[in-house]
UniProtKB/Swiss-Prot annotation:
It comes from Mus musculus. Protein phosphatase involved in regulation of Akt and PKC signaling. Mediates dephosphorylation in the C-terminal domain hydrophobic motif of members of the AGC Ser/Thr protein kinase family; specifically acts on 'Ser-473' of AKT2 and AKT3, 'Ser-660' of PRKCB and 'Ser-657' of PRKCA. Isoform 2 seems to have a major role in regulating Akt signaling in hippocampal neurons. Akt regulates the balance between cell survival and apoptosis through a cascade that primarily alters the function of transcription factors that regulate pro- and antiapoptotic genes. Residues 314-326 have a biased composition (Polar residues). Mn(2+) 1 binds at residues 1166-1167. This is PH domain leucine-rich repeat-containing protein phosphatase 1. The gene is Phlpp1. One of its GO terms (cellular component) is cytoplasm. Interacts with the nucleotide free form of K-Ras (KRAS) via its LRR repeats. Interacts with AKT2, AKT3 and PRKCB. Interacts with WDR48 and USP12. The PH domain is required for interaction with PRKCB and its dephosphorylation. Keywords: Acetylation, Apoptosis, Cytoplasm, Hydrolase, Leucine-rich repeat, Manganese, Membrane, Metal-binding, Nucleus, Phosphoprotein, Protein phosphatase, Repeat.
Length: 1687
């Protein structure tokens, strides 16, 4: 049978790099930049195979496959070809475009495609058929591809998306799911969805994909073990596209996999797999499906020869084809860098938004999986299956064996074939774009994926199921069918091209010149053996130790020779002299290297590569972060036992592999001096390690060791033994015999008691590291000193007291972050003392430490500086900040060695008056109570370069000199947030070297121009928050000025800052600018100009056009008005400031009208040192939250899911980078859209939210760092290494943060979520980045914002304060001001539990009742009416309105009913300000007969009332409506047993009309006159009455209109359409009816309730009279202090 002609193929290119590939192709005359050649298998079993190079114009898409027989798919609607008839082969000259045109694939630029088809010459066709590189018309082909690339790529990817029927099948059962597999059996990387169950194994999935080969891409369904499933409904068994399908029959006995095409719409058949598994395949038939033929083999499968891709050009690096084995699999690894597998380059199309499933029952959360058992393969105990801790990887990906030492080089190409024929099909898993691990046959891919997602933080199985169906999950966890392509390997390819090659000696006439592919990769020369450069063997020539020589007999010819007895020589003729020189220089460098060090780290190795053994002279071998095991699973693979062949090996790194057991073979290497087996889940060390006599460094960190063998004592040269982060509970005794070890490294273990007796037996130990243990005490059995220990590290333990006097030779002591109250240290040789973040009240060092140079006792409780500190002669740095020190001793400044004194955040009222000459260079006294600095401070401190006296009470500055000459070298002066006036400005001229000046938020009104002119060295000035009206023009004299910050002033004239040549940042926001004058050319370095907050500023078109060239130009946007329906409850302002190296690594998010305009969303994102992650979060997070809100309404759930999905959306950027984030969402009550609002905050990292409630800060965030006990335990369980600076693997100190996926599972994105119901006492909340909260406490931040009415100015103030206090990081602050009115807040109903949570400490009085919304554990309180804090009213009401519109009068009469003393009134009821709970015997106001208006009361009209209009009942501009808004009447039966009968009087002059009240309801209501409290002002000006209307709102004539300021504020002029009018002729009739109802009500109440012990006497309506003062004072004494409502 004739072999089928090969149809062109093109791999799915990376969209981000496709344009570069096109450019490269154009440069090379149209040659394909990244070819992937498809292998055609004969349909009859003959060994022939025709291959064809892919033309460059083949667009990305599903592979057309090979033509031939019935394998060709027909176009939809095309006639069915006859059986056995071969489909027509497209003309070779037409290339890919002609083929795609026939199938209807090209929708755009058909004329260009036709031109490309017709312009191809027969010569190009013949060259393509012959296997040579095709030369095509670059103009036509590239033009067509550039136009159609997006459309074709999108259509191709749409074919890969799951259809609704696929998703419905998965959602039908929680045991089902979807994994996306890159099917490398296809001729291009193909993301194939595989539907499976939790029981489906990796072997079943791999076998099924092997059977499909490179046939048409579609969704594969593998059902797992068991008998053939019964016939399912047609809806589920239908082909997944819903239109076409085909049956898949079991494979024939010959072993080849056939695909028999069936009729359309036929359900797929069940396919048995090896081992009893059954599969169901439903490939989707598309308008352009892939061709397939029965019996053809998948590319790269068993029996197919290995391939090497053809290069893109003759000289430049080329990209490896993912459809064939990586060329680097046959390369020599001896390169200096370990180019490991990098982040995945594929960027996948996102799935459309998953539809919400209404009515889906809440699935129970699965048990929280143990981290150590989440992703468990068949591996040694404690080994993680995803490759985090343990597992097994693919083969030698960075450098695969070309030939073993005993195998001739020419046969190297057959080794891979042998391995391929013997190894079963495999499935690989890759985490966060790093190394890949081969799954064992019985591992379950879906279970692995689900466990990974649960580790991220998802809580529900159905949500994990949905996330698994998204193809974008590949950046987190990805599966491969076949060994994945290593991007890092292609980076090692230095040179490549197609040249004339000759092998052997030049004198032999047999070896003729042939054109072959030549590649210089790493340190090897690779030459293809056949013409098409992808089939057959690849000859590898090691160049290290070899030579490269010029061949003079031939032009541009070089001779490459390898070293050794079996050396080979290749002669290569280059086309140009440039290529000749390039190869000569590069190969000469490689050949001159020596084989001594090999780096194979991060190569996904599961066994040792064969070419590693080319040389036995290796001295350093790095194999870290692979999947090596004690015994490889492949029988022909080389295990760790082969390492003993390296008889000269000195250093071996096996860390972060999956050994599970100690590799005993390394004990036979006598020369080994350094061995690293950290993080390998080792549980014991064998006794054979004693044979390594020359071992000097032995690293065993990050394992599960609890003991060490006694044989270690024979390691006499061992000087370093790493035992950190294991499971030791005590110091191993064998260390007593290891006399060369001088450092005890046992950080992160489980030591509770340090037995000093054990240390005494180890006199060789000088340095003891026991940080991050659980030490509680030091046990000294004897009084003898431990004289040999010089450095002691006890950080992050649980010590309460530490007596270190027993260490009499101690030099360095670390005891930070303990619980120390007292500390005693021996000072004989003490050089450094670190004791910050404790509770120290007493610090004794004896004797005086004469060698002490550094001392940090900040963040303690010290009240004075110890006397011995002043006597320490060599002290250079003293940090006593954040204590309670009231005075600094004068002798401290006399210390000639003191250079840096940090005394901020104390209680200093003054500094020593008379200072002698001091050597202090840095003085920080910020955040104290200093009113003035010593008058001679700046004159005596002639070495002072830095002074920070911010946040004090300074009114003036001391002079720098008493004459015109000055010796001041002061360069940085920070005086922000003081009381400085204009008088201090002339004193600044005494510091001519001043570079940075911060005088923000003082009382400056002017800055004299003459004084500014003398500060010529000034580079940065911040004079914000003053009352300046202008900046002097002499600022132009400061030629080095680069930053001018002057926001929040009264500046009216734009300063001359644009004349400064070095200016970069100008901030003139929140001023009174009306116009600006600009030069013709802006300063060349200007990067930021902020003009926001200038409402009168008007810019012409020319100025705007000029300013828009600035990188960051901020100006107020024209107001478009509030969105319809948006509540006037919040407004915001935000600011951002650059940090180190002027990089802005923060971003802010503010959406005032989120979703339906009744929600808001704010966020702050901090990337620390990277810019990419914050911007990605800013652009994406709001969309993710909107999608999550469609899936769930639970605050914690949708916030958690938003952060976890964002982890996926970060893509490859989040694999190595990360960032902190805080997100705040405001949403209304879903039932009552005009009611209360809920604020939900979620954060990771150190970004935080602080709410100001009633003037006090309330933190809504939490920082997860190593000081957090629960996080510390979690990190230690994962065996992560915590460096001495408290960072996970030295990367980040936050254990919960977005990004940094390579640190999974130690670092996760699950946020802290907290929700709180907003109340009228909530004034604003602040979102800030790490830099803000590191510099400001939450109390100071809240106090600073409270004094600023404008949100933008408040955010600016926070940023300026942080910078002046010493922050050098990027800062972002968002201030959201709240205006929650009383009408939008109600807390009457109890939480579901019915129990009240405890009050928040320090925020509310203990007697206050509180309600928490859905989160009883967060401790956030909501004030009740009885607390008095709910009595604040809207500012819209005035005192005159209060006096004129109140329809009731004050009375000193007792209430008409009293409570039964034996039972409390509503013991479990919570009331809001609209419905207060009455306090017995409290001062009250009584209503005048429940009337429409006080005009009809018995007391007559008030003085300001007017006569009402006939037929309209009102009380002026306010109305009263009675509505049962809290459904209180539903509880009346329960309450009646607590109430006494109170007869109600019927009024003949007023009418009561109750909403939601019928006749039966009227007869059953109880009187609530005994359930009152103190009178309370309303938004409508009335006072809460003491009758049943406590639970209703009184009725009136006007229908209420909701206003932002008040709940029932009616218009001043009543609208006739909105009035509730009773015609005069019906008024009397209505009165009679209501009177009759009231009489019936009284009778029923008397029948239902027992008579009271003392029936109250009817009280006449009281006349207006003053209230008795004694009673009022008595009652007010019992109210909280915040209750100040005037009556």
């Amino acid at each position: 049978m004739e072999p089928a002609a090969a149809a062109p193929a093109q791999r799915l290119a990376d969209p981000t790099g496709e344009d570069q590939a096109l450019a490269a192709a154009a440069a090379e005359g149209g040659r394909c930049p990244d070819p992937a050649l498809s292998a055609a298998a004969p349909s009859g079993g003959n060994g022939g195979a025709a291959r064809e190079e892919a033309p460059c114009e083949a667009p990305p898409g599903p592979l057309p496959g090979r033509a031939g027989g019935t394998g060709r798919r027909r176009r939809r609607g095309a006639p069915q070809p006859a059986a056995g008839g071969a489909a027509p082969v497209p003309a070779a000259g037409g290339g890919a475009n002609s083929l795609l045109l026939k199938r209807g694939r090209l929708k755009r630029n058909l004329s260009a495609a036709a031109a490309a088809s017709s312009s191809s010459s027969p010569s190009s066709a013949s060259s393509a058929a012959g296997g040579l590189p095709a030369s095509c018309s670059a103009s036509a082909s590239l033009c067509t591809r550039s136009l159609d690339r997006k459309t074709l790529l999108l259509k191709h990817r749409q074919l890969l998306q799951l259809q609704p029927s696929d998703r419905d099948w998965v959602r039908h059962q929680l045991q089902r799911g979807c994994v996306h597999v890159f099917d490398r059996h296809m001729a291009s990387s193909y993301l194939r969805p595989v539907l499976c169950t939790l029981d489906t194994t990796a072997a079943e999935v791999a076998a099924r994909l092997l059977q499909l080969g490179h046939k048409g891409g579609g969704v594969v369904k593998v059902l797992g073990y068991g008998p053939p499933p019964a016939a399912a409904p047609a809806a589920s068994d239908q082909t997944l596209d819903g239109e076409h399908g085909r049956d898949v029959e079991p494979p024939p006995s010959s072993g080849t996999v056939g695909a028999v095409r069936g009729p359309a719409r036929a359900p797929p058949a069940d396919l048995p797999l090896p081992g009893g598994a059954w599969t169901r395949c439903a490939p989707r038939i598309s308008p352009a499906p892939s061709d397939s033929s029965p019996g053809e083999l998948f590319a790269g499968g068993p029996g197919s020869p290995p391939r090497a891709p053809r290069p893109a050009s003759d000289t430049e690096s080329f990209s490896l084809s993912p459809s064939a084995e990586s060329v680097s699999d046959r390369l020599d690894p001896y390169s200096s860098g370990g180019g490991g597998s990098s982040s995945s380059s594929e960027e996948l199309e996102a799935d459309p938004a998953m539809p919400h499933r209404p009515g889906r029952p809440a699935q129970p959360r699965p048990p929280s999986p143990k981290t150590s058992a989440l992703l468990q393969p068949k591996a040694p105990t404690g080994v993680d299956s995803t490759g985090v801790i343990a597992g097994e990887g693919p083969g030698d990906d960075k450098a695969m064996a070309a030939a073993a030492p005993d195998v001739p080089l020419s046969t190297s190409g057959r080794i891979r074939e042998t391995v391929q024929k013997t190894s079963p099909p495999s499935l690989y898993v890759q985490l966060h774009g790093e190394t890949t691990r081969r799954l064992e046959a019985d591992e379950k891919p879906l279970q692995i994926q689900n466990d990974y997602l649960f580790q991220l933080g998802f809580g529900e199985l159905w949500r994990v199921q949905e996330e698994g169906m998204d193809s974008e999950i590949g950046c987190l966890i990805r599966f491969y069918a076949g060994k994945p392509h290593s991007t890092g390997s292609s980076e090692r390819i230095q040179l490549s091209g197609m040249y004339n090659v000759r092998k052997g000696k030049m004198q032999l006439p047999v070896n003729r010149w042939t054109r072959r592919q030549v590649i210089l990769c790493g340190t090897c020369l690779i030459v293809s053996s056949v013409k098409d450069s992808v089939s057959g063997k690849m000859h590898v020539l090691p160049l290290i130790g070899g030579k490269v020589e010029e061949v003079k007999k031939h032009q541009h010819c070089l001779a490459f020779s390898s070293s050794g007895p079996q050396s080979q020589t290749y002669y290569i003729c280059f086309d140009t002299f440039t290529e000749y020189l390039r190869w000569l220089r590069q190969v000469s460098k490689v050949a001159s290297q020596r084989i001594s060090s090999v780096d194979l780290s991060c190569c996904s190795l599961e066994h040792l590569p064969a070419n590693l053994f080319y040389s036995q002279d290796l001295t350093h071998l790095n194999l870290k972060q692979n999947f090596l095991r004690q015994t490889p699973t492949l029988p022909a693979a080389r295990g760790l036992g082969e390492l003993q062949r390296f008889t000269k090996l000195k250093s071996l790194n096996l860390s972060n592999n999956h050994l599970g057991a100690f590799p005993s073979a390394v004990c036979s290497i006598p020369t080994l001096a350094e061995l690293n087996v950290s993080c390998n889940a080792l549980r014991e060390v064998p006794a054979a390690v004693g044979d390594m006599q020359n071992l000097q460094t032995f690293l065993l960190d990050g394992n599960f060791l609890q003991s060490l063998p006694a044989e270690l004592e024979s390691m006499h040269q061992l000087s370093y033994l790493g035992l950190s982060f294991n499971e030791f509970t005590d110091i191993p005794e064998v260390l007593e015999k290891l006399t060369a070890v001088d450092k005890l490294c046992m950080a992160g273990n489980c030591v509770e008691t340090l037995r000093l007796q054990a240390l005494r037996r180890m006199p060789h130990i000088k340095h003891v590291d026991l940080r991050l243990n659980i030490l509680r005490k030091l046990m000294a059995d004897e009084v003898d000193f431990v004289q040999h220990v010089t450095q002691l590290d006890l950080r992050d333990n649980k010590l309460g007291d530490l007596d270190a006097m027993i260490f009499n030779n101690i030099e360095v002591l670390h005891c930070e972050r303990n619980q120390l109250v007292t500390l005693n240290v021996c000072g004989y040789f003490l050089k450094a003392l670190y004791a910050s973040s404790n509770e120290l009240a007493q610090l004794d060092v004896y004797p005086v430490p004469n060698y002490l140079s550094y001392m940090d006792v900040s963040r303690n409780c010290l009240e004075s500086v110890p006397e011995w500190v002043c006597e320490s002669r060599k002290l250079e740095v003293l940090d006593i900040g954040h204590n309670q020190i009231c005075e600094l001793p004068a002798r401290l400044f006399c210390n000639s060695s003191l250079r840096k004194l940090l005394a901020g955040h104390n209680r200093l009222a003054r500094l020593p008056e008379r200072l002698e000459r001091t050597s202090v260079e840095v003085l920080d006294v910020q955040h104290n109570q200093i009113t003035e600095l010593p008058p001679n401070l700046l004159m005596k401190a002639d070495s002072l370069r830095f002074l920070n006296a911010s946040a004090n009470k300074l009114e003036t500055l001391p002079p720098a000199t008493l004459s015109e000459e000055t010796s001041s070298i002061l360069q940085e002066l920070y005086l922000t947030n003081n009381c400085l006036t204009d008088k201090c400005v002339p004193l600044l001229t005494g510091h001519p070297r001043l570079k940075i000046l911060h005088m923000a938020y003082n009382r400056l009104q002017s800055f004299p121009a003459s004084k500014m002119a003398k500060l010529e060295e000034l580079e940065e000035i911040d004079i914000s928050g003053n009352k300046l009206k202008a900046i002097p023009t002499t600022i132009m004299n400061c030629r080095r000025m680069h930053t001018v910050i002057a926001h929040s002033n009264c500046i009216e004239v734009f300063p001359e800052v644009m004349q400064l040549p070095e200016v970069k940042c100008v901030d003139l926001s929140c001023n009174e600018l009306s116009e600006i004058t600009l030069p013709e050319n802006l300063p060349p370095k200007l990067q930021e100009l902020d003009l926001t907050g200038n409402p009168r500023l008007a810019l012409d078109h020319k100025s705007l056009e000029l300013l828009n060239n600035i990188r960051c130009f901020k100006i107020d946007q024209p107001s478009a008005g509030d969105a319809s329906g948006a509540p006037a409850v919040w407004s915001h302002g935000y600011t951002e400031a650059s940090g180190v190296k002027n990089k802005l690594c923060v971003a802010a998010l503010s959406v005032n009208n989120f979703r339906d305009n009744r929600e808001a969303l704010y966020g702050v994102f901090d990337g620390d040192r990277n810019v990419e992650v914050p911007y990605l979060l800013q652009c994406t997070m709001s969309d993710i939250l909107a999608e999550e809100l469609q899936k769930t309404k639970n605050e914690e759930e949708y916030m958690v899911n938003t952060f976890i999905v964002m982890q996926r959306k970060l893509g490859t950027a989040g694999q190595k980078l990360g960032g902190a984030a805080v997100l705040c969402h405001i949403k209304p009550d879903p039932v009552d859209l005009g009611g209360s609002f809920t604020l939900t905050s979620a954060n990771v990292g150190k970004c935080q939210t602080v709410l100001c409630r009633n003037g006090k800060p309330l933190s809504l965030s939490r920082s997860y760092i190593m000081s957090c006990e629960e996080e510390r335990k979690r990190i230690k369980q994962h065996k992560a290494i915590i460096t001495e600076d408290g960072k996970v693997n030295g990367v980040t100190e936050s254990t919960r943060i977005l990004g940094y996926t390579f640190l999974h599972p130690s670092v996760v994105p699950r946020p802290h979520v907290q929700s709180v119901l907003l109340t009228p006492q909530d004034e604003f909340f602040i979102l800030g980045s790490k830099g803000l909260w590191d510099s400001l406490s939450i109390d100071e931040a809240v106090e600073a914002v409270r004094n600023v009415p404008d949100a933008l100015a408040a955010a600016k103030k926070l940023c300026t304060l942080a910078q002046s206090y010493g922050c050098h990081d990027s800062i972002s602050a968002v201030v959201v001001q709240l205006s929650v009115t009383e009408d939008s807040f109600c807390c009457c109903e109890l939480s579901a539990g019915g129990s009240m949570p405890p009050p928040s400490p320090g925020i509310f009085p203990p007697s206050v009742n509180m309600v928490i919304k859905d989160r009883p554990s967060d401790g956030l309180g909501v004030p009740s009416s009885s607390s008095g804090m709910a009595s604040e009213i809207s500012s819209e009401l005035s005192t005159s309105e209060m006096s004129s519109e109140v329809g009731s009068t004050a009375s000193d009469e007792p209430p008409s009913g009293v409570l039964n003393e034996s039972s409390p009134a509503y013991p479990n009821e919570q009331r809001c300000m609209l419905h207060p709970v009455c306090l017995s015997n409290s001062f009250q106001r009584q209503l005048s007969s429940a009337t429409f208006s006080s005009a009809f009361s018995d007391n007559g009209l008030d003085s300001d009332d007017e006569e009402p209009i006939e037929g309209v009942f009102s009380n002026g501009s306010r109305v009263e409506v009675e509505v049962d808004i809290h459904c209180s009447r539903a509880k009346e039966k329960e309450r009646q047993q607590h109430l006494l009968q109170v007869p109600a009087e019927a009024s003949d002059e007023g009418i009561v009309i109750s909403a939601n009240e019928d006749e039966s309801g009227l007869s059953k209501k109880a009187d609530f006159s005994a359930v009152g409290t103190i009178g309370r002002r309303r938004a409508n000006g009335s006072v809460a009455p003491q009758e049943r209307s406590h639970n209703v709102i009184e009725v009136a004539a006007d229908a209420p209109l909701r206003k932002p300021g008040g709940y029932f504020a009616a218009p001043a002029q009543p609208d006739p359409d909105d009035q509730f009018i009773i015609p005069p002729e019906l008024e009397e009739e209505v009165k009679e009816i209501m009177k009759h109802h009231q009489e019936q009500q009284q009778q029923q109440q008397q029948q239902q309730l027992p008579p009271p012990p003392q029936p109250p006497q009817p009280q006449p309506q009281p006349q207006p009279q003053p209230q008795p003062q004694p009673q009022r004072h008595f009652q007010m004494d019992h109210l909280p202090d915040c209750y100040d409502t005037p009556l």
